[in-house]
Structures are given as structure tokens and as C-alpha cells.
UniProtKB/Swiss-Prot annotation:
Lineage: Eukaryota, Metazoa, Chordata, Craniata, Vertebrata
Protein name: NAD-dependent protein deacylase sirtuin-5, mitochondrial
An annotated GO cellular component: cytosol
Cofactor(s) of this protein: Zn(2+)
Complex and partners: Monomer. Homodimer. Interacts with CPS1. Interacts with PCCA.
Subcellular locations according to the entry: Mitochondrion; Cytoplasm, Cytosol; Nucleus
Major location (coarse): mitochondrion
Active-site residues from the entry: H158 (proton acceptor)
Gene designation per UniProt: Sirt5
Transmembrane segments: none
Keywords of this entry: Cytoplasm, Metal-binding, Mitochondrion, NAD, Nucleus, Transferase, Transit peptide, Zinc
Origin species: Rattus norvegicus
Keyword Transit peptide recorded: yes
Length: 310
């Protein structure tokens, strides 16, 4: 999996495009910490005092809703994993196959619901908003389950399955049609022996802007593409201001998102990882809570005894 290039930003330009900033003594302690704590009571103290919480979410959160990840053992659509299909080169070479893949993913999501992890995050955001506190979700997921759960402060850094972008005029539009075009009806079956449809390009999703008619593509960030600089600027601002960070259901291997939480930890801010297993970044964080996010997050984000509940 090739790291994604990153647009320069105040935090990220030094991390990914040049020399790393020298760490303060406090951040050096955090970055070399060998055994993060799993003490929920200690985390809850940090949570009670936090005024600006950033939650970085990945595929592990949605996997608990039954969303396919297309990664790791068994993570295939037909004979391919996501990194073989989610690329500009794959779309240029075979747009029919790529659209079949995304049509399948769109149709799967119509029957998926937010799980207790998504709901705990959304309920926490709403509750703390009434107390003058801020919760922001930065998600790598493209399934819109955070939206469906009720999250309002949401940065979908990799885009969404339910938006398209015209390859001719660049227009971005929401699209919840099922199927997205008639030619994809009944297509996209994931089994390895499925015959490829080879849909003619002129029958694939087309732009509906007046006078255009260009080929549409999913409005998602593919491997090898830059993230939207405007979204990265918002991410930069939220990470710089947060006083508590949660990393939930992410493997911490896809860049630039893999460096968001370590950058926060480097300035001494508490970071808590919620994941089924450890990751390459685990030892940089103050807390690590193993297990399903749908189990650990409701406890972690429940109302604290010090909260003003109206």
C-alpha cells in the first residue's frame, strides 16, 4: 500500500514533506512510551477535563456493522483487494470494472446501520455540544455511517460512496440512486468466478450538468491521489486545537491519516487508541483499549459524573 501524497499544511508539511520538527522533552516522553495504559478510570479523567476532542476513525469501526474492508486475508472483491481497484490507473484502464466494484459497495451500504460505536460518538458529540465542548470526527471511511448515526462535526477525508465527480467538468454531486445507472442493475457480484460485465463507457454513470455528459467517477480519494487541501486545512486546525484525541478502529498505516494522532501526541496531548489489536503507532499513545469499538466506546464516552446534565 503506497502512502498518499499530502498537500502542505502547517502540521503536515514537516511530517511528510520535509524534516520533522524537534520534539519537546514532554513529547519525547510520549513518543518513546513503551506500554500505553488500559486504565479506563484514568482515561475518563482526561475525558472529563477535555474541551476539544478529536476522534479519528477507520475501517474497524464500520467492520462491526458488517461493512467489507477489502483488506487482509479474505478481503477480496472477486480476485482483487481495494488497492488494486481504487486507483486512477485502474479507472482509466477499466472504468466498467471499477464502477461495478463501487456499485456493489453502494448497494451493500443500503442495508447497513450504525453500530454502538458510531452511536456512542454521535451521542457524545450532541451531549458535549450542550455543555460548550467540541467533538469532531475525522474519518477515513467512505460509508456515511457516522452521518447516519447523527454526527454533525464530520470531516470525511477520503470522500463518500454517495457522491460523484465528473471527469470532464469536475462537478461534485450527491447521488443516492439505486442503481446509479441502468447498466449497473444487477451487476457487481463479488464472487471470484463472476463474469466481468464490460459495460460500454457511454452506458456508465454520466454527468447531468447542462451541456456536459462527461464520465462520472466516485468522489473518493484513490490510492496515489492527494487529499483535498481544503479538508486538510480543517484537519490541521482541529488537531492543533484539540486537548484529547481518540483513534478508533484504524490500523494507522494509511498516510497521511496515520500521522494525525502521533502529531497530536508529540505535543503532549493525551491520545487513546481503541482497536482490536495493537498498531504501529500504539506505543506513541497514552492509552490503548483492545476490543470491539462497539463495546469499548460506549463506556469510554458515557456521561461523566462531573458533567452538567440538563
Amino acid at each position: 500500500m503506497r502512502p498518499l501524497p499530502v498537500a502542505p499544511g502547517r502540521l503536515f508539511s514537516q511530517l511528510c514533506c520535509g524534516p520533522k520538527p524537534s520534539a519537546s522533552p514532554q513529547s519525547k516522553i510520549c513518543l518513546t512510551m513503551a506500554r500505553p495504559s488500559s486504565n479506563m478510570a484514568d482515561f475518563r479523567k482526561c475525558f472529563a477535563n477535555a474541551k476539544h476532542i478529536v476522534i479519528i476513525s477507520g475501517a474497524g469501526v464500520s467492520a462491526e456493522s458488517g461493512v467489507p474492508t477489502f483488506r487482509g486475508t479474505g478481503g477480496y472483491w472477486r480476485k482483487w483487494q481495494a488497492q488494486h481497484l481504487a486507483t486512477p490507473l485502474a479507472f482509466a484502464h477499466n472504468p466498467s470494472q471499477v464502477w461495478e466494484f463501487y456499485h456493489y459497495r453502494r448497494e451493500v451500504m443500503r442495508n447497513k446501520e450504525p453500530n454502538p460505536g458510531h452511536l456512542a460518538i454521535a451521542q457524545c458529540e450532541a451531549r458535549l455540544r450542550d455543555q460548550g465542548r467540541r467533538v469532531v470526527v475525522i474519518t477515513q471511511n467512505i460509508d456515511e455511517l457516522h452521518r447516519k448515526a447523527g454526527t454533525k462535526n464530520l470531516l470525511e477525508i477520503h470522500g463518500t460512496l454517495f457522491k460523484t465527480r465528473c471527469t470532464s467538468c469536475g462537478n461534485v454531486a450527491e447521488n443516492y440512486k439505486s442503481p446509479i445507472c441502468p447498466a449497473l442493475l444487477g451487476k457487481g457480484a463479488p464472487e471470484p468466478d463472476t463474469q466481468e460485465s464490460r459495460i460500454p463507457v457511454h452506458k456508465l454513470p454520466r454527468c447531468e450538468e447542462a451541456g456536459c455528459g462527461g464520465l462520472l467517477r466516485p468522489h473518493v480519494v484513490w490510492f496515489g491521489e492527494n487529499l483535498d487541501p481544503a479538508i486538510l486545512k480543517e484537519v490541521d486546525r482541529e488537531l492543533a486545537r484539540c486537548d484529547l484525541c481518540l483513534v478508533v478502529g484504524t490500523s494507522s498505516v494509511v498516510y497521511p491519516a496515520a500521522m494525525f494522532a502521533p502529531q497530536v501526541a508529540s505535543r503532549g496531548v493525551p491520545v487513546a487508541e481503541f482497536n482490536m489489536e495493537t498498531t504501529p503507532a500504539t506505543n506513541r499513545f497514552r492509552f490503548h483499549f483492545p476490543g470491539p469499538c462497539g463495546v469499548t466506546l460506549p463506556e469510554a464516552l458515557a456521561p461523566h459524573e462531573t458533567e452538567r446534565i440538563s
